[in-house]
Amino acid sequence: MDSITSAASVVAAGLAVGLGAIGPGLGQGNAAQGAVEGIARQPEAEGKIRGTLLLSFAFMESLTIYGLVVALVLLFANPFS
């Protein structure tokens, strides 16, 4: 593998992890804000809101894990070599 392909793979892996973490991070912050506001308005619905929040956190976190998997593939099982 030549040096340009190797360097591009490292940069792409960094971008995959970085950009893959920004979106879910912002989404989790917005979801938590909405959940806290919802619980403050309707304390009796806390259990339902919390369950939905945790499920949505799991879906958002899976996007970050997909970015990590792409980065690991680019670094260790490079398809471009």
Swiss-Prot record:
Keywords: ATP synthesis, CF(0), Hydrogen ion transport, Ion transport, Lipid-binding, Membrane, Thylakoid, Transmembrane, Transmembrane helix, Transport. It is a multi-pass membrane protein. It is found in: Cellular thylakoid membrane. InterPro entries: ATP_synth_csu_bac/chlpt, ATP_synth_F0_csu, ATP_synth_F0_csu_DDCD_BS, ATP_synth_F0_csu_sf, ATPase_proteolipid_c-like_dom, F/V-ATP_Csub_sf. F(1)F(0) ATP synthase produces ATP from ADP in the presence of a proton or sodium gradient. F-type ATPases consist of two structural domains, F(1) containing the extramembraneous catalytic core and F(0) containing the membrane proton channel, linked together by a central stalk and a peripheral stalk. During catalysis, ATP synthesis in the catalytic domain of F(1) is coupled via a rotary mechanism of the central stalk subunits to proton translocation. Key component of the F(0) channel; it plays a direct role in translocation across the membrane. A homomeric c-ring of between 10-14 subunits forms the central stalk rotor element with the F(1) delta and epsilon subunits. F-type ATPases have 2 components, F(1) - the catalytic core - and F(0) - the membrane proton channel. F(1) has five subunits: alpha(3), beta(3), gamma(1), delta(1), epsilon(1). F(0) has four main subunits: a(1), b(1), b'(1) and c(10-14). The alpha and beta chains form an alternating ring which encloses part of the gamma chain. F(1) is attached to F(0) by a central stalk formed by the gamma and epsilon chains, while a peripheral stalk is formed by the delta, b and b' chains. Belongs to the ATPase C chain family. This is ATP synthase subunit c. It comes from Prochlorococcus marinus (strain MIT 9301).
